[in-house]
Amino acid sequence: MTDDTVPEIDTVEALDAREALNVKALTPFQMARRRYFHHKGALVSTVIMGVLLVVVIFAPLTARYGINQQVLDISAGKNQYLSPRKVAWMGSDQIGRDLFSRLIWGIRTSLFIGVASAILSVIIGTTVGAVAGLRGGWFDDVMMRVTDLFLAFPFIVIIIIMRAFLGAVPWITGIIGDVSSIRFIIALFAIFGWMGVARLVRGQVLALKEREFIEAARAVGASNTRIVMSHLLPNSIGPILIALTLSVIGAIVGESTLSFFGLGPQPGANAVSLGQLVELSSEGAKQGNWWMVVYPCGALVLLAICINFIGDGMRDAVDSKLDIGG
């Protein structure tokens, strides 16, 4: 006689194991995306920057007026220092130009300066830092002493000094443009903005190059170039992304600071930068025209906050040790 009255009962451990088998493993990219989306500040900042990029990229369509177009013909009445209204959403400046339209064009120019100079400085700094950390010796000593020398002074002070020095050398200005050109400012920030990135990457390489997987790569005959490109840099991507976002912010704020002192780029009659608008805001503030201060400076602060949050989100995304739960 068989006993068929006792049902088969799954233990908790068996159920957990069965459930684990049914869960599809996430790829590294999916895990990084999940961690990034879990960072609320980065998510909101990404949306804001996405909208802002669409607006500035399509500036010819989104700007209500041309860069130097006046909101009203002077014969139709006063057009200088108009407060925000229907004809000028953010008011007008000292010669009647629409501040909203000029802000769109200015953010476009400043983002170009920031992104271009940041990419160049990160490329230079990553290359120097990786080579110095991996090879060591005299090259490492020389590069770190140069880095220490430049990092000993405030960045903006170095930029002002080197702007005057490089601008006086004809063959240099023949290559990278006049001191008032956007190309010169981008080159200036790139040439003297890589030191912090180099120190950061060097530290990462020094921490990684004695690890077992690097020793294994050397054992199978991998070259230094392959070790750097396939192992060291991929494992240093988090700090590099943080350095990139900070470099973008630094270049945008640096350009605005130079413009405030009258040393910024002069994009030309058909262009404007955010730094120029910040420079003009001081004149508006003296006359009590608050909109000339609030909107350009507010845009500068918004850019800095959003880019910083995006950098934080990227850092979390590549941090495999970060546990965000189910």
Predicted segments, located by residue:
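Non-cytoplasmic
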Residues: V157-I161, F165, I186, G196-L200, ...
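Gly/Trp-centered helix-boundary motif
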Residues: M1-T126, A130-V131, W138, A152, ...
